[in-house]
Amino acid sequence: MIIIEKIKRGLIVSCQALENEPLHSSFIMSKMALAAKMGGAIGIRANGVNDISQIKLEVDLPIIGIIKRNYNNCDVFITPTMKEIDELCNEGVDIIALDATFRNRPDSVSLDDFFKSIKKKYPKQCLMADISSLDEAINADKLGFDFIGTTLYGYTKSTNGLDIADNDFNFLKTLINSNLKSTLIVEGKIDTPLKAQKCFEMGVDLVVVGGAITRPVEITKKFVEKINQVKR
């Protein structure tokens, strides 16, 4: 696919802001994406059709699109149903990322059936699997996802609190050694340039960084926390 050729190696910046954050604005996210491009980013990850449409007016970079939507009594919220897929496809998104964990989906459809339904309706759409474990990555690879991201490692009940850098990046090493056919994208808790560099040194070609670049409230808190540790 052409999009895979355009997004071969480099940094992808996730430009997202939650509703309770000061930068929650499609206009601001579009400017954040422009700043990311000016800094050398080769792609953008964005949430919601409004943000994505505004970002497309500012940059011509490939976009990984998601829609975060909560459903009752369901932990899956990243592009969880065909409704979100339809919205993203109608907008025209280069890559759609979705939760590819083994957790129950809101409509009780299995991931396998969901993937097949998407491919039947949108056969040319590139898809990214957001996973949290090796078994989920292997399953996504067998299904035929174009990309597999470590997005949810550390964010599910079974991996809560884990960091991609734990044990000298052991989880990432395991994924790399699994010889996945899908292109691997490292995402989640890549909060320093050195962590990103380490991923590339290990052989990964695509890394997504979000909060460390685009969430000034959280960045400020980290500085303040360290400063406040100094006792006088």
UniProtKB/Swiss-Prot annotation:
CDD domains: NanE (cd04729). Pfam families: NanE. The keyword Transmembrane does not apply. Keywords: Carbohydrate metabolism, Isomerase. Pathway: Amino-sugar metabolism; N-acetylneuraminate degradation; D-fructose 6-phosphate from N-acetylneuraminate: step 3/5. InterPro entries: Aldolase_TIM, NanE, RibuloseP-bd_barrel. Coiled coil: none annotated. One of its GO terms (cellular component) is cytosol. One of its GO terms (biological process) is N-acetylneuraminate catabolic process. It comes from the Bacteria. Its EC number is 5.1.3.9. It catalyses: an N-acyl-D-glucosamine 6-phosphate = an N-acyl-D-mannosamine 6-phosphate. GO terms for molecular function: N-acylglucosamine-6-phosphate 2-epimerase activity. It is an enzyme of class 5 (isomerase). Disulfide bonds: none annotated. Converts N-acetylmannosamine-6-phosphate (ManNAc-6-P) to N-acetylglucosamine-6-phosphate (GlcNAc-6-P). HAMAP family: ManNAc6P_epimer. PANTHER family: N-ACETYLMANNOSAMINE-6-PHOSPHATE 2-EPIMERASE-RELATED (PTHR36204:SF1). Belongs to the NanE family. This is Putative N-acetylmannosamine-6-phosphate 2-epimerase. It comes from Borreliella afzelii (strain PKo). The gene is nanE.
